[in-house]
């Protein structure tokens, strides 16, 4: 496995087992003092969208024990900003289908009462 793109950006707290339906969830804790927030944005930190897509990829790659590269983000919706000072524990719900060296993934990043990101796309297995 490759090392995370953003070192110390998050810590995975818990992950459910893969189900027969190719679904699982993972709960991660964002690090509100990570250096990325000094530029995005110093007064009110907001998790950058690209880092959230990377988070979806890294947690999924770890779960299936494969290296992945993003092939296509066919439908990505950023529905609300994640301020890690207000809510740093988030859950990622996955549904996926592996076909040869490609994975179709649908993932949602949510908090206690809100969905932050909806992702539908494809990853290549290296």
Residue positions per predicted region:
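A structural detector for beta-sheet-dominated domains
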Residues: 19, 29-31, 79, 110, ...
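Compact, glycine-rich, soluble single-domain proteins
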Residues: 43-48, 52-53, 57
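HotDog/MaoC-like acyl-thioester-processing domains
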Residues: 23, 95-126
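Catalytic strand-loop segment that frames the active site of acyl-thioester-processing enzymes
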Residues: 4-47
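Hydrophobic beta-strand-centered segment that forms part of the acyl-chain substrate-binding groove
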Residues: 57-96, 100-104
């Amino acid at each position: 496995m490759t090392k995370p793109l953003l070192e110390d950006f998050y810590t995975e707290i818990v992950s459910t087992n893969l189900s027969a339906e190719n679904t699982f969830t993972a709960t991660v804790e964002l690090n509100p003092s990570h250096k990325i927030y000094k530029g995005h944005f110093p007064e009110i930190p907001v998790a950058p969208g690209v880092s959230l897509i990377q988070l979806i990829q890294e947690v999924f790659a770890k779960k299936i024990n494969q290296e992945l590269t993003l092939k296509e983000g066919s439908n990505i919706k950023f529905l609300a900003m994640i301020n890690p000072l207000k809510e740093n524990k988030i859950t990622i719900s996955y549904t996926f289908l592996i076909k040869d060296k490609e994975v179709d993934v649908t993932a949602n990043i949510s908090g206690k009462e809100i969905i932050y990101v909806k992702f539908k796309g494809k990853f290549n297995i290296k």
